[in-house]
């Protein structure tokens, strides 16, 4: 897996960096594992926009991914590695000894023909799934459950990996990709290894059209709107926002204001908060 760039014969090809798709071995999805997925385009059940800047984009079929890895102690062979338009990670098609086929997230370095297995006694090899209690300290894992039997909920994006750093009582301590250190029940399952397509973070759309293909619409700054449309709007020329800090279109503080519930139940399981990440756009004062 790697990236591909182009000679700058147009402005967009000067900037674009795309995946070379070298690891893909099958172009058509497994029909029995795909379903039609209605795209909400940022609307709720009343048709009102609840998530701005979404809409359009290419049609997609949803691939049913096995996040639970609940087919225990039955070996499965990787028969294909495929592209999934619904996520930035690749997916692997595996065939179990009883003939059933399933999709899983493709771990880095997992090859076609490799045999994987899920269960408490599985060997510590990429693609195998085990309870956190049975995974040695220092091991890299992904697709981690937060509640036993619910299926993996965290560490699922391309290139993501968490590290097992401690075990004490009924909990295992994980260091997550965000830098957060938290406790997770020891009976929760996780998959060994790092999620594949590690170069996903190095890709560049190169042009607005590529984002439109993905269903991402333009983001208009509040300061160039009229006062009726945004609290930052109005003024003569390029006027400042006229406030002590940036706000949302509905007047709520944003870009740094804490939104986490102070009494959230999972707070007691977080040992160290995640690293701060800057979400400010150009100029640092827009939303």
From Swiss-Prot:
Domain of life: Bacteria
Residues covered by region (Disordered): 203-287
GO (cellular component) term, any one: large ribosomal subunit
GO biological process: translation
PROSITE patterns: RIBOSOMAL_L2
Alphabetized GO MF terms: rRNA binding; structural constituent of ribosome; transferase activity
InterPro entries, alphabetized: NA-bd_OB-fold, Rib_uL2_dom2, Ribosomal_uL2, Ribosomal_uL2_bac/org-type, Ribosomal_uL2_C, Ribosomal_uL2_CS, Ribosomal_uL2_dom3, Ribosomal_uL2_RNA-bd_dom
Gene3D superfamilies in the cross-refs: 2.30.30.30, Nucleic acid-binding proteins, Ribosomal protein L2, domain 3
Keywords: Ribonucleoprotein, Ribosomal protein, RNA-binding, rRNA-binding
Key word RNA-binding present: yes
Record flagged with keyword Transmembrane: no
Alphabetical list of Pfam families matching this protein: Ribosomal_L2 (PF00181), Ribosomal_L2_C (PF03947)
Record's compositionally biased regions (Basic residues): 209-220, 258-287
Function as written in the Swiss-Prot or TrEMBL entry: One of the primary rRNA binding proteins. Required for association of the 30S and 50S subunits to form the 70S ribosome, for tRNA binding and peptide bond formation. It has been suggested to have peptidyltransferase activity; this is somewhat controversial. Makes several contacts with the 16S rRNA in the 70S ribosome.
Similarity comment: family membership: Belongs to the universal ribosomal protein uL2 family.
Subunit structure: Part of the 50S ribosomal subunit. Forms a bridge to the 30S subunit in the 70S ribosome.
PANTHER family, A to Z: LARGE RIBOSOMAL SUBUNIT PROTEIN UL2M (PTHR13691:SF5), RIBOSOMAL PROTEIN L2 (PTHR13691)
Stated name of the protein: Large ribosomal subunit protein uL2
Originating gene: rplB
């Amino acid at each position: 897996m790697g990236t591909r760039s182009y000679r700058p014969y147009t402005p967009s090809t000067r900037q674009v960096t795309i995946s070379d798709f070298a690891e893909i071995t099958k172009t058509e999805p497994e029909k029995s594992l795909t379903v039609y997925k209605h795209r909400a385009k940022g609307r709720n059940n009343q048709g009102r926009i609840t998530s701005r800047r979404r809409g359009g984009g290419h049609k997609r079929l949803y691939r049913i991914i096995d996040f639970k890895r609940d087919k225990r102690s039955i070996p499965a062979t990787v028969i294909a590695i495929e592209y999934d338009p619904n996520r930035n990670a690749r997916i692997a098609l595996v065939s179990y000894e009883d003939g059933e086929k399933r999709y899983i997230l493709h771990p880095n370095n997992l090859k076609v023909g490799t045999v994987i297995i899920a269960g408490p006694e599985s060997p510590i090899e990429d693609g195998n799934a085990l309870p956190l209690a049975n995974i040695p300290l220092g091991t890299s894992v992904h697709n981690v459950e937060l509640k036993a039997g619910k299926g993996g909920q965290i560490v699922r994006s391309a290139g993501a990996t968490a590290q097992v750093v401690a075990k004490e009582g009924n909990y295992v301590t994980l260091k997550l990709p965000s830098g957060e250190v938290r406790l997770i029940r020891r009976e929760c399952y996780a998959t060994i290894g790092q999620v594949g397509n590690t170069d996903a973070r190095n890709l560049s759309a190169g042009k607005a059209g590529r984002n439109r293909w993905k269903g991402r619409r333009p983001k208009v700054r509040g300061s160039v709107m009229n006062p009726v449309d945004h609290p930052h709007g109005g003024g003569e020329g390029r006027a400042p926002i006229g406030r002590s800090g940036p706000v949302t279109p509905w007047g709520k503080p944003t870009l740094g204001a804490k939104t986490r519930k102070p009494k959230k139940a999972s707070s007691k399981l977080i040992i160290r908060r995640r690293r701060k990440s800057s979400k400010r756009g150009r100029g640092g004062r827009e939303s």
